[in-house]
């Protein structure tokens, strides 16, 4: 009964240890350079064929022979599966691991699971991949991962580094989210990504979460999620700007969604613009974030706004800005609406001195509540202006046209001369 509950831990079989006290020979140096173990066992011969002779097809049966002989079974099975994957024999590698992993030690089971996950992904067996990922996450939840330890030593690109249980959990949750998205199960994929991000922030997972939200039609949430993406860390485990590929995917999806919504908007330009703004409200957030340190932007000084709600980047902050007075401009002369007739044909009428008097009297009549003194003064000015008279020729007509249309031609000089004459006449009357 007890034998069924507790299984004794198996240790990894190995080749006979070489005797101590023997100096390193030239052959041993060769094996150290090529990372080939020393000896003449079946596993050593298989590794020599794989790494030195560069013949992976002939190395596969030699690994089989080493496993059957019980020589370094853990390493032989892992190496054989990797070589099979490189030779596009992933299905055979999966069956080999499933049938032979019972011969391996407990310490090798986790590494075999990781190789299986890669093989499942290569073969497109998403259901098997999702099931294995959930099983590994269950082991982490129960505290059975890493053989009960908090960290393990991993190897990537020839370098060793320590991996904690939390880091392994975020990696597995990210892979689970990706596999679920391939199955169009976006609800569970969103949950997996959010659980991973609750453990530790990650740019790549944040971008994939945004894509997952877009797949569900939650555009606003996706945009808000992508706004929180920070620049990549230089010495991160994935290298510089590891999330740029996910950013490109997000941008492509937004373009597709934008085209679809623009198509649904019909020919109405206003509706298309509204849909476009709803999707691409801030185009800057879809640009790849540079790999730089987090810096706090200085608050712009008052008055540096260029009118669009954003500060002017070209203004030197150390120099006091010159406040532009909007009233300090070369304004054109002011003309009352009583003087200007909207119909251009009516502007061509020939004006006499009596008409000029009527126009001037019309100006004075617009102001209500004038005192008797100001009224008498105005009538006196109108009388003397009538005596001076307005020019009864085409100059005055051209001046009025130029004032209405605002054209800057030679007529301006005539207009100025005409109005100078009027002003001079009025000044003399005062």
From Swiss-Prot:
GO terms for cellular component: nucleus. The keyword Coiled coil applies. Residues 1-21, 346-376 are annotated as: Disordered. Its main location: nucleus. Belongs to the MS5 protein family. This is Protein POLLENLESS 3-LIKE 2. It is found in: Nucleus. One of its GO terms (biological process) is cell division. Residues 81-107 form a coiled coil. Keywords: Cell cycle, Cell division, Coiled coil, Nucleus, Repeat, TPR repeat. Gene3D superfamilies: Tetratricopeptide repeat domain (1.25.40.10). Probably involved in the regulation of cell division. TPR repeats lie at residues 40-73, 74-107, 110-143, 170-203, 205-236, 238-257. It holds the Pfam family TPR_19. Signal peptide: none annotated. The keyword Nucleus applies.
């Amino acid at each position: 009964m007890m034998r069924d509950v507790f299984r004794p831990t198996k240790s990894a079989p190995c080749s006979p240890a070489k005797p101590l006290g023997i100096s390193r020979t030239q052959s041993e140096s060769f094996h150290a350079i090529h990372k080939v173990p020393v000896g003449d066992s079946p596993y050593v011969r298989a590794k020599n064929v794989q790494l030195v002779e560069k013949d992976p097809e002939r190395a596969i049966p030699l690994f089989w022979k080493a496993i059957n002989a019980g020589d370094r079974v853990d390493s032989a099975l892992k190496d054989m599966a990797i070589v099979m994957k490189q030779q596009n024999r992933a299905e055979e590698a999966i069956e080999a691991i499933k049938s032979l992993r019972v011969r391996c030690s407990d310490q090798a089971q986790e590494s075999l699971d990781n190789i299986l996950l890669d093989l499942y992904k290569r073969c497109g067996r998403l259901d098997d991949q999702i099931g294995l990922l959930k099983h590994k996450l269950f082991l982490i939840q129960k505290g059975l991962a890493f053989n009960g330890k908090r960290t393990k030593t991993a190897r990537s690109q020839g370098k060793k580094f320590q991996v904690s249980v939390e880091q392994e959990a975020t990696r597995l949750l990210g892979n689970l989210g990706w596999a679920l998205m391939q199955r169009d199960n976006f609800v569970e994929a969103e949950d997996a990504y959010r659980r991973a991000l609750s453990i530790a922030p990650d740019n790549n997972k944040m971008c994939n979460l945004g894509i997952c939200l877009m797949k569900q039609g939650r555009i606003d949430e996706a945009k808000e999620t992508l706004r929180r993406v920070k620049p990549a860390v230089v010495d991160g485990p994935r290298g510089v700007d590891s999330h740029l590929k996910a950013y490109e995917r997000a941008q492509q999806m937004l373009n597709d969604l934008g085209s679809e919504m623009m198509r649904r908007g019909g020919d109405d330009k206003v509706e298309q613009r509204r849909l476009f703004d709803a999707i691409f409200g801030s185009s800057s957030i879809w640009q790849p974030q540079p790999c730089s340190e987090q810096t706090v932007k200085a608050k712009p000084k008052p008055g540096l706004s260029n009118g669009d709600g954003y500060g002017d980047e070209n203004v030197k902050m150390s120099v006091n800005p010159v406040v532009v007075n909007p009233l300090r401009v070369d304004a054109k002369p002011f003309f009352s609406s009583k003087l200007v007739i909207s119909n251009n044909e009516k502007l061509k009428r020939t004006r006499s001195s009596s008409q000029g008097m009527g126009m001037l009297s019309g100006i004075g009549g617009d102001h209500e509540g004038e005192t008797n003194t100001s009224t008498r003064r105005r009538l006196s000015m109108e009388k003397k202006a009538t005596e001076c008279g307005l020019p009864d020729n085409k100059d005055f007509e051209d001046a009025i046209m130029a004032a209405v249309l605002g054209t800057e031609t030679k007529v301006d000089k005539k207009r100025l001369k005409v109005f100078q004459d009027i002003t001079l006449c009025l000044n003399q009357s005062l």
